[in-house]
A protein has these predicted regions:
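Mixed-charge interfacial surface used for oligomerization/domain docking
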Residues: 1-5, 19, 55-77, 83-234
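N-terminal glycine-rich anion-binding loop in soluble enzyme alpha/beta folds
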Residues: 1-27
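A short glycine/small-residue-enriched secondary-structure motif
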Residues: 7-13, 37, 41-42, 64-69
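Short catalytic-loop micro-motif centered on adjacent basic/acidic residues
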Residues: 24, 49, 78, 195-196
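Short coil/turn segments at secondary-structure boundaries
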Residues: 27-31, 193
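N-terminal glycine-rich phosphate/adenylate-binding segment common to multiple enzyme folds
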Residues: 32-63
């Protein structure tokens, strides 16, 4: 199914919690991209396609394949976000702002590249269960981690890969550490948009946002729920 089209996020996460086996995920086929690209080209419009990191998914390659089949190739650009989920969403928001301000495809791509170089994504997981089910860690590692109440803290590196950063004992310490990392790695937070993503823990996300505002007073804070593609594996 397509995320949010045939199954709501709440329904998806309810099914995921009860599942013994993880659902599988797949990138959109080139035909889906091609249809949208053709519609934009037929309307005389330029299009910028922003995809999940090519290091995490074949979506970028799928979009490039679609572009290659398009007669009006120069009207479309495919941009590798080198991130995922709400980090990718931030780039989409920035691209939309620029398009509405009248910037063209080339100008938008130039600015997106600058924004991408400054983008920073860090997160923690409450359980190792889904990493184990997805084959990313062994069952023994997952069991030991849960027994010791280990919460991994991960980040998306500049190549667009999810890599371990550190570990914390207990969720409270992990959340506190996230706030510290934002201060350590964030630049000019008073002038930045910070997006907080969560998976079925909206109240905690709101509390985190409140603490973030109190400590660092960023320009803007938004909260969103993580979609099924990333949620499946985390």
């Amino acid at each position: 199914f397509r995320d949010c089209f045939k199954l709501s996020r709440d329904d998806f996460y309810s099914l995921l919690t009860a599942a013994n086996k993880l659902p599988t995920t797949a990138q959109p086929p080139p035909g889906d991209f091609l249809q949208v690209m053709q519609e934009a080209a037929a309307a005389g419009q330029e299009a910028v396609v922003i995809t999940i990191s090519s290091a995490l998914s074949g979506t970028y390659e799928s979009a490039l394949m679609a572009q290659d089949q398009l007669d009006q190739k120069d009207q479309v650009a495919v941009f590798d976000s080198r991130t995922a989920s709400l980090g990718e969403g931030l780039l989409v928001l920035k691209a939309q702002e620029m398009a509405e301000a009248g910037l063209g495809k080339s100008e938008i791509l130039k600015e997106l590249t600058k924004i991408r170089s400054r983008l920073f994504s860090v997160f923690t997981l409450d359980t190792l269960e889904y990493l184990q089910k997805g084959g990313r860690i062994s069952k023994a590692q997952a069991v030991m981690g849960d027994v010791l109440n280990i919460k991994p803290i991960l980040e998306v590196n500049k190549e667009g890969r999810i890599v371990p950063r550190e570990k914390a004992r207990g969720r409270r310490r992990a959340i506190k550490r996230l706030l510290d990392i934002i201060a350590e790695d964030g630049r000019e937070l008073y002038n930045q948009l910070v997006i907080i993503g969560h998976s079925r823990c909206a109240e905690e996300a709101i509390a985190f946002a409140d603490e973030l505002k109190k400590l660092y007073n960023p320009k803007e804070v938004q909260i969103g729920e993580i979609g099924s593609t990333i949620g499946t594996h985390t």
